[in-house]
């Protein structure tokens, strides 16, 4: 009798808790950046602005994208899924150059800077002779 009672109590509890846990994270789809076709961009990201001239002499061209919660609250969290996708595409993070919200990546002889905020991110292609 006790076995049936325990099974009656535990079985719904186990089913309820397993139904409330998240399954595998939804796979993100990627397109390409408008400033460099080798830079993957989440397809859900909306291009806001392209900057062709900058007061910063190190920046060749830049683009700003909007994507809900890419950087978490106040942009404090690193979007590891996106950075893993960059790595898969051949971009190597220059960890020693990281500056707060800004991470640098290199592929062949091109360096990009990615600045992460809560709901936006900026990508800047750096000039060949950039000092950063």
Predicted regions and their residues:
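C-terminal motif of bacterial Sec signal peptides marking the signal peptidase cleavage site
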Residues: 15-19
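Compositionally biased P/S/T/G-rich terminal and signal peptide-adjacent segments
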Residues: 23-70
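Positively charged n-region of N-terminal signal peptides that target proteins for export
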Residues: 1-5
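Extracytoplasmic electrostatic interaction patches
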Residues: 50-132
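Sec-dependent N-terminal signal peptides
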Residues: 6-13
């Amino acid at each position: 009798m006790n076995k049936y009672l325990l099974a009656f109590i535990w079985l719904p509890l186990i089913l309820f808790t397993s139904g409330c846990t998240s399954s595998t994270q939804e796979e993100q789809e990627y397109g390409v950046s408008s400033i460099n076709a080798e830079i993957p961009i989440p397809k859900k990201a909306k291009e806001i602005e392209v900057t062709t001239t900058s007061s910063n002499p190190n920046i060749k061209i830049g683009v700003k994208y909007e994507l809900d919660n890419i950087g978490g609250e106040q942009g404090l969290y690193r979007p590891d899924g996106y950075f893993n996708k960059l790595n898969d595409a051949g971009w190597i993070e220059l960890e020693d150059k990281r500056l707060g919200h800004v991470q640098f990546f290199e592929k062949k002889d091109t360096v990009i800077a990615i600045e992460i905020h809560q709901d936006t991110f900026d990508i800047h292609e750096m000039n060949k002779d950039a000092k950063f």
